[in-house]
Amino acid sequence: MGEEGFLAHFAFSIGGLPITQSVLTTWFIMISLFIMAWSTTYKCSLLQPSTYQLIWEGVLSTMYDAIKEVLPDHVELIFPFVATLWIFILVSNLIGVIPGFYSPTADLSVTASLAIMTFLSVHWFGIRAEGWREYLKHYIKPTPFLLPFHLISEISRTLALAVRLFGNIMSLQLTALIVLMIAGFLVPIPILILHIIEAIIQAYIFGMLALIYIAGGIQAHELKSQGESL
């Protein structure tokens, strides 16, 4: 587990552009996930699926069912984004367990980027489901005076999403480091178990909140449209 702070520690620079530990680890995770996805799809078989393939199918099926329960009419549209978000955040949270690796989600800039992506996806999926004119109209109905309150709500929940994940992962790693400094390496297994459980929980919460925000945006606008058409 690396050193934590509001921003990841500097690693090196390329042409004056600073490269941090979180950037390096993020690229490592993305490349690793791409290779894993490619190898799974390249070798997949309907007749004789491998254990590796069955594990991935089980994970993706569980995610698909979870999304379907929240947003059944748009699951095909939402699934790629939310599933990718879940997997990336889970791996990012867990990689801090490996000595020498830094959890990107312990860097506020990374969690802020994920929150901004979620913020943009809420509006992107809403516009795709309804059209940009009808979607934007709902922000000024029943009166344009509600627009500032809508904007404040969108910004505040995006900030909360970023800070929640960052704070939990950073505090988890700091707590683990403090315990290890005090007790030494006599109790590594409980610390690792705590880290793994918390990493899974935080990845699930972030992905579920993103899903709820997307579903809320789509369904709220659809309900308003249905009410106006009656």
From Swiss-Prot:
Signal peptide: none annotated. InterPro entries: ATP_syn_F0_a_bact/chloroplast, ATP_synth_F0_asu, ATP_synth_F0_asu_AS, F0_ATP_A_sf. Its main location: membrane. Disulfide bonds: none annotated. GO terms for cellular component: plasma membrane; proton-transporting ATP synthase complex. The keyword Cell membrane applies. The chain crosses the membrane at residues 17-37, 78-98, 107-127, 165-187, 198-218. One of its GO terms (molecular function) is proton-transporting ATP synthase activity, rotational mechanism. It is a multi-pass membrane protein. Pfam families: ATP-synt_A. GO terms for biological process: proton motive force-driven plasma membrane ATP synthesis. It is found in: Cell inner membrane. It comes from the Bacteria. Keywords: ATP synthesis, Cell inner membrane, Cell membrane, CF(0), Hydrogen ion transport, Ion transport, Membrane, Transmembrane, Transmembrane helix, Transport. F-type ATPases have 2 components, CF(1) - the catalytic core - and CF(0) - the membrane proton channel. CF(1) has five subunits: alpha(3), beta(3), gamma(1), delta(1), epsilon(1). CF(0) has three main subunits: a(1), b(2) and c(9-12). The alpha and beta chains form an alternating ring which encloses part of the gamma chain. CF(1) is attached to CF(0) by a central stalk formed by the gamma and epsilon chains, while a peripheral stalk is formed by the delta and b chains. HAMAP family: ATP_synth_a_bact. Key component of the proton channel; it plays a direct role in the translocation of protons across the membrane. Belongs to the ATPase A chain family. This is ATP synthase subunit a. It comes from Legionella pneumophila (strain Paris).
